[in-house]
C-alpha cells in the first residue's frame, strides 16, 4: 500500500477513535446533566448532581440507527404496547429503541447520544439527543441535518411512546448539537412558533415538541463567567490543546465533578489521541516541506 494512503488511513482511524472518545466523554451522566441545566428551562438553577437522577437508564452512544424504520427495535410476539405504555413510571423506556443491530448494520448512521429524561413532576418524559461536531459542516447546513434528526426521533415514537392516533402522548424532543472550532462561543434555540395571519383562532397543540439547540464552541477556552459555564466545561473537555491535568483540574475545582476512574480514563485516552493526531500532522507538514524543498532545488538545477 502506498505510504501516503497508509497515512491517510491511519489518520482517518485516529479521527474516528477521537470522535468515539468525545462521544463517550460527553455521555457521562454528570456532563449530560450540565448540558441539561444550561439548555432546558425546567432544569435551570438546579444542581447538575440532582439532575443526574432524572436521566433514565444509561445513555445510548453510537448505537441507535438514524435510518428510517431502524430507530425502533422489533417487538417480540405477544408484546402488548398498551400495557407497556400504561406503566409511565418505568425507567426502561429507552430500551425499546433499536439496540440489536449494531453489528449486523455496521456502517449505518447512528445518533451520537440518545436517552430519556424524567421531568420533575415524576410523570412526563422528554427525549434528548446530543450530537458532537468537530466543526461546522461544509457539505450541508447543520440546521437541516438537525431538523432531519429531530423529525426521525419524533416519528419513531409511534409504537414506542404512543399508539394509534394518540398524538397527544408524544414526548418533547431536544436535539442538542455541539459544534467545535467556531469563531465565537454561541448558543441558539430553534423551535416552532405560531404566526397569526388572518383571524385569531387558537389552534390546539404543543409547539414545544421540537427543540434544536446548537452550542458553538470557539477554539479559545472562555473566561470563567456565568454565561460561559457550559462553554468552558465543553471547551475544556474537548480541547485538543489542554493537558490532561489541566482538564481534570477544571472539572474538579470549577465544576465539582467527581473524577471517578472511568471519566479520568476517558479524558486521558482522548488527550493521548489528540497528541497522536497533532504529532502526525506535524510530521506530515515536515515531510511536505521537505518534498517542496527538494522539488525547488531540482527546478533550480535544471
Predicted region positions:
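Elongated, amphipathic alpha-helical interaction scaffolds
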Residues: 1-302
Amino acid at each position: 500500500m502506498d505510504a501516503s494512503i497508509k497515512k491517510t488511513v491511519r489518520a482517518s482511524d485516529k479521527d474516528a477513535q477521537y470522535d468515539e472518545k468525545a462521544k463517550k466523554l460527553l455521555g457521562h451522566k454528570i456532563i449530560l446533566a450540565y448540558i441539561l441545566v444550561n439548555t432546558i428551562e425546567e432544569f435551570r438553577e438546579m444542581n447538575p448532581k440532582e439532575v443526574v437522577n432524572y436521566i433514565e437508564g444509561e445513555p445510548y452512544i453510537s448505537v441507535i440507527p438514524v435510518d428510517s424504520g431502524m430507530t425502533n427495535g422489533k417487538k417480540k410476539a405477544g408484546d402488548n404496547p398498551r400495557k407497556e405504555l400504561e406503566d409511565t413510571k418505568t425507567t426502561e423506556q429507552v430500551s425499546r429503541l433499536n439496540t440489536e443491530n449494531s453489528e449486523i448494520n455496521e456502517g449505518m448512521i447512528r445518533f451520537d447520544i440518545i436517552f430519556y429524561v424524567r421531568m420533575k413532576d415524576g410523570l412526563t418524559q422528554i427525549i434528548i439527543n446530543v450530537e458532537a461536531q468537530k466543526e461546522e459542516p461544509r457539505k450541508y447546513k447543520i440546521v437541516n441535518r438537525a431538523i432531519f434528526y429531530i423529525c426521525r426521533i419524533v416519528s419513531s415514537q409511534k409504537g414506542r411512546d404512543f399508539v394509534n392516533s394518540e398524538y397527544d402522548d408524544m414526548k418533547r424532543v431536544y436535539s442538542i448539537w455541539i459544534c467545535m472550532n467556531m469563531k465565537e462561543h454561541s448558543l441558539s434555540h430553534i423551535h416552532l412558533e405560531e404566526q397569526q395571519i388572518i383571524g385569531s383562532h387558537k389552534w390546539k397543540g404543543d409547539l414545544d415538541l421540537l427543540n434544536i439547540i446548537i452550542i458553538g464552541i470557539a477554539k479559545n477556552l472562555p473566561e470563567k463567567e456565568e454565561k460561559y459555564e457550559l462553554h468552558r466545561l465543553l471547551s475544556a473537555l474537548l480541547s485538543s490543546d489542554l493537558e490532561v491535568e489541566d482538564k481534570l483540574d477544571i472539572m474538579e475545582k470549577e465544576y465539582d465533578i467527581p473524577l471517578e476512574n472511568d471519566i479520568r480514563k476517558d479524558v486521558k485516552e482522548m488527550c493521548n489521541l489528540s497528541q497522536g493526531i497533532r504529532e502526525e500532522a506535524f510530521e506530515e507538514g515536515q515531510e511536505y516541506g521537505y518534498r517542496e524543498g527538494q522539488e525547488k532545488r531540482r527546478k533550480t538545477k535544471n
